[in-house]
């Protein structure tokens, strides 16, 4: 959520920065904001006047009583003043609720270093990497016609038909050594992020409440993208509250600090978790219908950092590097893209996407997204730290994939495929595979 004081101080500047997101929709209802703000000021002024009057009248009552004089008329004025004060306080609370509802639908302001643009076409390539020397980061061509991960994976245990039978479209079943390779990828990612990059591994619920999703920005704006595990009952009844399957473990991990004041000495907090993620993919009808690229259920190793505000952009670069290390150790060609204003997520101020090379498509596809949210989530979460002056200040939060496990499997199948139909197992994964070096086609 944006800092309301920033909007009060310089609304035109904030609107101009929001407009760089190049969205056809209007993010902030300026008229509604200005109307509420004007009423808030008027009610606030009247409240302060009433409080002053009440104090003056209370003194008069004391003086009259000390003289033995009748104070009933003044007491009646105090009673009336009290009723009006209560009414004003109630209206101020209502205004605050209405203002919060207005601001919850407004995305974060892009950082000044983010290029302006619309969609993927406006993104800027930062760097490329590949394991092949002398190619300037470009991928090397296979010596045979590459097959996509569906054609490579199905003979090895990738079963889309069974996933559809069990649940529906965009679900997958994996069997045998292929399922083990999928598991090996997640274990390898966790080991690197914990042992080499200092993240604390966490096990988290796969179901969260609406407060958690509101804190990280999925609610109220993106409810259609979520799978509801339980519809909400009557307000105020916790046992009947709405529950949702997590779209990413960013949600529970970031909510560790909701309503907390973290000692400054404990920053940064670095968390990682391997979880399934559940997304309805609303608005993605007809996109990536073949294979594992876009699924309703997929696994991901997530990285979350909670940092001092002065350190968040340093942390963004470091976290991007933490995701890159996974791809480098796997020997997968990739590129890093700086997202433009029109392609960034709702809560981000700046985002890097890592895109892995898929030879069958002869293109790069997103495999990780790493974002700095500054205080946007922290303000919704009321996540703070106590600074050197003893004052509470909002932390900055960052999140990123380290990596999407299914898409990494796709990249391994395509980049390590062999002409005989098998798949070479990357060297770093072989210890997790009991020493296996190859996924071979089953004997006829």
Curated annotation (Swiss-Prot):
Localisation: Cytoplasm
GO BP annotations listed: selenocysteine biosynthetic process; seryl-tRNA aminoacylation
Recorded catalytic activity of this chain's protein: tRNA(Ser) + L-serine + ATP = L-seryl-tRNA(Ser) + AMP + diphosphate + H(+); tRNA(Sec) + L-serine + ATP = L-seryl-tRNA(Sec) + AMP + diphosphate + H(+)
Principal localisation: cytoplasm
Key words, A-Z: Aminoacyl-tRNA synthetase, ATP-binding, Cytoplasm, Ligase, Nucleotide-binding, Protein biosynthesis
GO cellular component: cytoplasm
Transmembrane segments: none
Top EC category: ligase
Protein's pathway: Aminoacyl-tRNA biosynthesis; selenocysteinyl-tRNA(Sec) biosynthesis; L-seryl-tRNA(Sec) from L-serine and tRNA(Sec): step 1/1
UniProt-listed Gene3D superfamilies: Bira Bifunctional Protein, Domain 2, Serine-tRNA synthetase, tRNA binding domain
EC number(s) from the headed UniProt entry: 6.1.1.11
Record-listed ATP binding positions: 279-281, 366-369
Span of the signal peptide: none
Pfam families, per database record: Seryl_tRNA_N, tRNA-synt_2b
Gene Ontology molecular function terms on file: ATP binding; serine-tRNA ligase activity
Subunit architecture: Homodimer. The tRNA molecule binds across the dimer.
Homology family: Belongs to the class-II aminoacyl-tRNA synthetase family. Type-1 seryl-tRNA synthetase subfamily.
Domain remark in the UniProt entry: Consists of two distinct domains, a catalytic core and a N-terminal extension that is involved in tRNA binding.
Protein name, entry field: Serine--tRNA ligase
Highest classification ranks of the organism: Bacteria, Pseudomonadati, Pseudomonadota, Betaproteobacteria, Burkholderiales
């Amino acid at each position: 959520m944006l800092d309301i004081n920033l909007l009060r101080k310089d609304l035109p500047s904030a609107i101009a920065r929001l407009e760089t997101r190049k969205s056809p929709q209007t993010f902030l209802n300026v008229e509604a904001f200005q109307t509420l703000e004007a009423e808030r000021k008027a009610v606030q002024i009247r409240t302060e006047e009433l409080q002053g009057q009440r104090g003056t009248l209370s003194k008069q009552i004391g003086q009259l009583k000390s003289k033995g004089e009748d104070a009933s008329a003044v007491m009646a004025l105090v009673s009336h003043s009290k009723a009006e004060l209560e009414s004003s306080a109630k209206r101020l609370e209502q205004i605050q609720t209405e203002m919060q509802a207005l601001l919850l639908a407004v995305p974060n302001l892009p950082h000044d270093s983010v290029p302006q643009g619309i969609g993927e076409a406006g993104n800027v390539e930062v760097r490329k990497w590949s394991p092949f020397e002398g190619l300037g980061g470009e991928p090397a061509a296979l010596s045979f016609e590459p097959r996509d991960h569906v054609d490579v994976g199905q003979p090895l245990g990738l079963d889309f038909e069974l996933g559809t039978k069990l649940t529906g479209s965009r679900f997958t079943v994996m069997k045998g050594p292929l399922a083990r390779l999928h598991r090996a990828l997640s274990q390898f990612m966790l080991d690197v992020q914990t042992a080499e990059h200092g993240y604390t591994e966490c096990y988290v619920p796969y179901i969260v409440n609406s407060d958690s999703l509101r804190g990280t920005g999925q609610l109220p704006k993106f409810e259609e993208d979520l799978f509801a595990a339980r519809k909400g009952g009557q307000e105020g009844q916790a046992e009947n509250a709405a529950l949702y399957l997590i779209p990413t473990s960013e949600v529970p991990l970031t909510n560790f600090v909701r309503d907390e004041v973290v000692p400054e000495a404990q920053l940064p907090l670095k968390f990682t978790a391997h979880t399934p993620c559940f997304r309805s993919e609303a608005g993605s009808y007809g996109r990536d219908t073949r294979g594992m690229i876009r699924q309703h259920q997929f696994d991901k190793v997530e990285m979350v950092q909670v940092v001092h505000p002065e350190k968040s952009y340093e942390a963004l670069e470091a976290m991007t590097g933490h995701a890159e290390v996974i791809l480098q150790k796997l020997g997968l060609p990739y590129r890093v893209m700086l997202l433009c204003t029109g392609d960034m997520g709702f809560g981000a101020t700046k985002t890097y996407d890592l895109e892995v090379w898929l030879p069958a498509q002869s293109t790069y596809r997103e495999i990780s997204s790493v974002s700095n949210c500054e205080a946007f989530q922290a303000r919704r979460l009321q996540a703070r730290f106590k600074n050197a002056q003893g004052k509470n200040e909002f932390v900055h939060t960052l999140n990123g994939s380290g990596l999407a496990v299914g898409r990494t499997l796709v990249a391994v199948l395509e980049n390590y495929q062999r002409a005989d139909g098998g798949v070479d197992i990357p060297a770093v994964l072989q210890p997790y595979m009991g020493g296996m070096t190859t996924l071979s086609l089953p004997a006829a």
